[in-house]
Amino acid sequence: MSETLDVIIIGAGSAGLAALREVRKRTQSFVIINDGPWGTICARVGCMPSKALIEAANAFHHRNTFTEFGIRGADSLTSDIPAILRRVRRLRNDFVASTVKTTEDLGDRAISGRAHLLGPDRLEVNGQILCARNIIIATGSSPIVPKPWNTLGKPIFTTDTLFEQEN
């Protein structure tokens, strides 16, 4: 692209997609750049799958109230962690698919790659220089495990690894 775009959005997470919705109302002269998998952190490894896991935990916890309703046998209920995690992953995949649909029709205006700012109105991605009147930085977050924790001897789960566990 040799022309100066109206907007470049760096990041296709929740904030980047919110920016995209607003930008599309005003101009078609834009690109959105995403480094990593498309689909928001919220949908892929954050808010949405964690709420599905919490929902299962709450459902299991409520077994303690069954006797109030005349329901007997709650003491013999068990949780099937692999089944719970399979459900969480299935729901998560649906959540991600719905967020990815937001960018499917963008064609070459959706770029996979890591953006490197070169100035207030320029950046480089995949060896290509792009210029824009406005650059929105919405790069999101990623988990960090402090190095001393790696010596604790137990697996440390982050949002990037928790939902991939089998049991």
Q: Where in this protein do the model-derived segments appear?
A:
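Glycine-rich flavin
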Residues: S2-L5, E22-Q28, I33-N167
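Beta1/beta-strand and adjacent pyrophosphate-binding region of the FAD-binding site
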Residues: M1-A15
